[in-house]
Amino acid sequence: MRQHVNPLSRNFNEIERIPALIEMFGDSKSNLHLDIGCAAGEFLFDLALINTNWNYIGIEIRERLVKTAKLKVRERDIKNLYFIFGNANNILHDVQSKFIFKNVKSISFNFPDPWFKKRHYKRRVIQPEFLNLLSNSLQKGSLIFIKTDVKDLFDYMDCIISNNFNFKKIDKNDFNFSESFNPSQVKTNREKYVIVNQLDIFERIYIKI
């Protein structure tokens, strides 16, 4: 069972130091993908080992998971993967993080915390203010991927992104995954669980225009 953490807690107001890209990666000029709410990062470990031409950053709000993931990166000496602890909204709004967007080509939101109760919707990761930040920071052609097994959450995220005129939807059937951050279409642990249990998956791709 995934433990939900309130992203609006004051505990996340203080941002950890974000090192320069050259400190994070072996090749700091490679295309960069952000995975927001990466949990233990197994999805990113698989991607980083398969697709070494890309760099990956995972942002996760549960500190214990980030500490474990960082230790694994060091133990395995992986040069194209980095993890950051904290609230993604706060981190990416922080002035010290602005340089990250220079190389970002895509961002994924895979099975984020649904926060089912209406009074908790403000805790959901995708909010209009966050989309405005991405709209103002991402380069044209950058991609956003959303995926969830909760229809209400999908509709909520889709509505917010679609209402931002700087993003438009892409037909997944026309999308060339071979040139993306996930050429082998690696699946997260949650997606594997959903498939095994024959549950619905709702997903969409958007491009910055």
From Swiss-Prot:
List, alphabetically, the InterPro entries matched: SAM-dependent_MTases_sf, tRNA_(Gua-N-7)_MeTrfase_Trmb, tRNA_methyltr_TrmB_bact
Domain of life per record: Bacteria
* UniProt-annotated binding residues for S-adenosyl-L-methionine: 35, 60, 87, 113
| Cellular component terms per the entry's GO annotation | tRNA methyltransferase complex
What pathway or pathways are given for this protein in its record? tRNA modification; N(7)-methylguanine-tRNA biosynthesis
ATP-binding found in the keyword field: no
An annotated Gene Ontology molecular function: tRNA (guanine(46)-N7)-methyltransferase activity
Function according to Swiss-Prot or TrEMBL: Catalyzes the formation of N(7)-methylguanine at position 46 (m7G46) in tRNA.
HAMAP family given in the database record: tRNA_methyltr_TrmB
What is the name of the protein in this document?
Answer: tRNA (guanine-N(7)-)-methyltransferase
